[in-house]
Amino acid sequence: MKFRYFLISSAFRISNDYQIEYHRLCSCICKYPSKVHSFIVLNKYAKFWIKKLNLSKHPEGGYFADTYKSDKIIRLPGYDGSRSICTAIYYLLTGNQFSSFHIMKSDEIWHFCSGSSLTLYIIDSKGKLKEAFLGPNISKGETFQLVIKSGCWFAASVNEKKSYSLVGCTVSPGFDYKDWEIGNRKRLAEMYPEHKQIIERYTSAVQI
């Protein structure tokens, strides 16, 4: 009885503001249980992978961690200096994030790992826009891996906005920030005016 009394009296000592927020939360859970559950699941799994894989924020959006860099070094025309033959990372996007349009000198292969499927928006060297789907639902046109050729501008977003996508990215010749360029919204829109809407959606208004 003393313990029960302590709990009740403690509850009444909570400030009015906290009581109001508590009742709002309870009301939200009762009214939108599936939405609240989805929010909890999103945080649970996205945060799990971010912590488990030691992911850090990526300048193009999302989170990443380096996983492999070949010891074999090569020199190729068009590259400033030597490069590792191959590199790989883990890359994670949450449903409210996107990978901004960017371009690379090397080919990149995306591999689906976990979570929801995502869409990649690829503008090739001829200016043609293509949408490709990375995910586990092969019958719905998704694929487990996708190659983005060097010289293409591309962006990505998660198809389920309450979920996340965890992928692996393999680059050959190996990744170097010297070979990577984030898209400038204004300049890209001028280069490809027919794709202005999608460019504005998947670029940042504040340029790096």
Where are the language model's segments positioned?
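Non-catalytic, conserved peripheral segments adjacent to functional cores
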Residues: 40-146, 155-156, 161-163, 173, ...
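Short hydrophobic targeting helices and cationic amphipathic motifs
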Residues: 6-7, 19, 23
